[in-house]
Amino acid sequence: MKTYNDLYLSTRKTLRLAGVVSHDLEARLIVSYASGKTREELLTCSRVFLTNSKILNNVDEIIKRRLNGEPIAYIVGEWEFFGLPIAVNESVMIPRTDTEILTEQAINLLKNRPTPTRVLDLCAGSGCIGLAIAANIPGCRVVLADISERALSICRTNMLRNRLTRNVTALEVDVMENPPALLGIFDIIVCNPPYIPRSDISLLDVSVRDYEPLEALDGGPDGLYFFRAITSNWTCLLKDNGIMLFECGIGQAKDVKDIMEEAGFNNISIYHDRQGIERVVSGHIK
């Protein structure tokens, strides 16, 4: 008879042999989800014997799904971002560590601005960026904006889950159109837009290509379609000396910088992610 720890170890081994990079983390998540226990509870009952065969069956089923390419975040329905539990499903992209760079820079810039501040999170998806900002900047008001009503439903779930409904709202908008007047003006606009060149989508890992929403990936022929549209249509919502920050793909930072300069931005900065890749571009507008 297996203990919970035995189940974790066997799950980890299966994932490792299958080439899953984060096999340790994912094994813990799988056993936690399959058993209905928190990770903390699993630590306290690691030597307890499993008497419920349903848990073993659940683990086997989850492993099959994972080895077929389904992301673990979609299987368990949640991922952690900037210390916040973020609900996810196939309507939204899974929060990435790379996106924490965009969030960190926005938070650092907001700390130097007089309160209260207003932030617009365009192409919000799960809302992870705007929610992390709201959780870390007291008095900050955040609007999560996305064209997808399914994504906005996830945003609202995450607002409730993280008790941020008082200072965060979610709104359906199309970044290809002029912004609605009711939005007002903002200190900062953050955006992690679709930026994969269309011809590259078929080359993506199966866990991304076959599961994550195409509309959150497809950046047009050159991957820069949304950067052009947003700087053209949405810059007018920034206050004097307001700031726009974009996450971008590998090799895109210089092009995004040029697009922002053409739109009238100055003091443009490029920030690297933890792998040394140019990942975030920010600029000020007067």
PLM feature segments, named:
Residues 1-47:
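Non-catalytic accessory regions of SAM-dependent methyltransferases
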Residues 15, 110, 159, 234, ...:
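Conserved hydrophobic residues forming the short capping helix/wall of the S-adenosyl-L-methionine
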Residues 32-109:
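Conserved AdoMet
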Residues 73, 196-199, 251:
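Active-site beta-alpha loop architecture of Rossmann-like, nucleotide-cofactor-dependent enzymes
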Residues 100-203, 229:
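Conserved SAM/SAH cofactor-binding pocket of Class I
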Residues 164, 212, 238-240:
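Helix-to-beta-strand junctions that scaffold the AdoMet/dcAdoMet cofactor pocket
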Residues 221-284:
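Conserved Class I SAM-dependent methyltransferase catalytic core
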Residues 195-225:
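Mobile active-site "lid"/loop adjacent to the S-adenosyl-L-methionine
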